[in-house]
Amino acid sequence: MSKIIGIDLGTTNSCVSVMEGNSPVVVPNSEGKRTTPSIIAFIEGGETKVGDPAKRQAVTNPSKTIFSIKRFMGRNFSEVTEELKNIPYKIIKGENDTPRVSIGNKLYTPQEISAMILQKMKKTAEDYLGNEVKQAVITVPAYFNDAQRQATKEAGEIAGLNVERIINEPTAAALAYGLDKNNQNKKIVVYDLGGGTFDISILELGDGVFEVLSTSGDTHLGGDDFDKVIIDWLVKEFKVEQGVDLSNDSMAYQRLKESAEKAKIELSSSTKTEINLPYITATPSGPKHLVKTLTRAKFEELSDDLIKRSLYPCKNALKASNLISKDIDEVILVGGSTRIPKIQEQVEKFFEKIPSKGVNPDEVVSIGAAIQGGVLSGDVKDVLLLDVTPLSLGIETLGGVFTKLIDSNTTIPTKKSEIFSTATDNQSAVTIRVGQGERSMFNDNKEIGRFDLIDIAPAPRGIPQIEVTFDIDANGILNVSAKDKSTGKEQSIRIQASSGLSKNEIERMKKEAQENADKDNKIKEEIEKINSADSIIFQTEKQLKEYGNKISEETKKKLEINLNNLKDARNSKNISDIDNYINKINNILSSSYQEIYKNNESVKNNESVKNNESVKNNESVKDVDFEEIK
């Protein structure tokens, strides 16, 4: 069986790992880095850049540089109004209230943008392994709902991957932490604060079994929010000092975002940092510069509410697992934002123990995903993962009530059935509305799908027996069926939210993604060929200048003709002609080296003859002693 790679598809950064024997390996990307920024840039001419190359040009191309797309995955446009305030690129309302990224005259779904990041991860693994990769385990925040999980799976399919399993990020981290601790029985907490989401999971480890006891979280809390409080502070301070509002300047905002992220990182190891942004904007009076010192104490004050927000899910998770903080043996910190000292301090205070620093918070999730891939492929044995569904699942019943069929923190996969009936006499059809959440009224929760059961046998209200079955697979994705027990009539759906994509749309996007990959490869090949042409032109002109007098006029003329032809091909970007003239010039240069060598040998021989004749002439001269006569 081919390798199943593990991908951590993050809000800020992504990472890919593979199993090598019994050990997981984090795979460096083409830039030599172990994590890749989850950033896509659309360049003039149709080229796309992914990762660090995209991040480097963000300041000069803010409207076409896409970041934090994970925050829009599987969500409706009406749900993302706050997120829209924090991005310089354009997102508009698409069909069925879906968010669409607008680039020029083309619209992209969040799944398509995420697929571009996944393609980069796929290519990174393929370059390392030396063969094509088709299967992957992809991680999601534990608190992702069904629609967000479906969207992640769709992104994988668009990228050309068979998504063998969707796994929760804290669970993946626990797998990575506990793989070599099979003989230890422990209760561990995984506190996972990533770029855009926060999760808390409590697991029990022992004898190769990883059982999730409870999970909670906040899908609107992450490192981006910590950056935002710094940005807001800078904007406010600059407006007071200079009277200029930077929040509406997309290029200035992008510079503020980069500086805020750097300041946050520096304050993890320093007590203060200087934010220096010359020429941040200009007014009629001249250019304006932003120079501010941010102390760790001020940053902690700005982010205090965010840190407190992360503790509420911690309380909920403990309560759901019927544990208290003293029952916890180990606390694992995951996600780059957990490097913030105040977070470490608050987590230690809450759980009454020092968090473990034995794992790399940026890499541990992808490592766990690779281990799960190894379990699925049979490379990793004696490991059993028992995950849970993060939110309750149910249907709408009479009066708009949300009736739960599966409670939150139920171990998956699982299946549950209940009998319902009609609300009116002789009702021939019912609409089953499926929801996910913890509120008592259906409309206060997230509707994740609906379908109709028709041709119900006429009967007084309350008589028909309609069996509704919920079936959650190991990916946490839901299938729902409804059956009229008197007629045997059955209707079922694999839940696909309004933000989901049809099979035809996924196939179309897969095709477009491959075409874009081919297009990018063509652009890359074109650049490489032009670079080769420039190198050959330089070398040939240098050879003509240095050795032009040592080759025949015929050879010299051939070189000059083909050199001019290569320059024309290079300027017109004609790849086939560039290859043709490079080959011709290389062949001519090869023969010219022989001419140069022969000329050099001839010169050496002539010098040798002259030296010999000089020696012979000198043989008749004898050395004698002489005495000066005075």
UniProtKB/Swiss-Prot annotation:
Biased composition (Basic and acidic residues): 619-630
Description of what induces expression: By stress conditions e.g. heat shock.
Compositional bias (Polar residues): 604-618
UniProt cross-references to PROSITE patterns, sorted A to Z: HSP70_1, HSP70_2, HSP70_3
Domain of life: Bacteria
Region (Disordered), start-end ranges: 604-630
Pfam families with a match to the protein in the record: HSP70
Keywords: ATP-binding, Chaperone, Nucleotide-binding, Phosphoprotein, Stress response
Modification sites for Phosphothreonine: 197
CDD domains from the UniProt entry: ASKHA_NBD_HSP70_DnaK-like
InterPro entries named in the record: ATPase_NBD (IPR043129), Chaperone_DnaK (IPR012725), Heat_shock_70_CS (IPR018181), HSP70_C_sf (IPR029048), HSP70_peptide-bd_sf (IPR029047), Hsp_70_fam (IPR013126)
GO MF: ATP binding; ATP-dependent protein folding chaperone; unfolded protein binding
Family of the protein in this entry: Belongs to the heat shock protein 70 family.
Function comment: Acts as a chaperone.
HAMAP family (alphabetical): DnaK (MF_00332)
The protein's name in its UniProt record: Chaperone protein DnaK
Source organism of this protein record: Karelsulcia muelleri (strain GWSS)
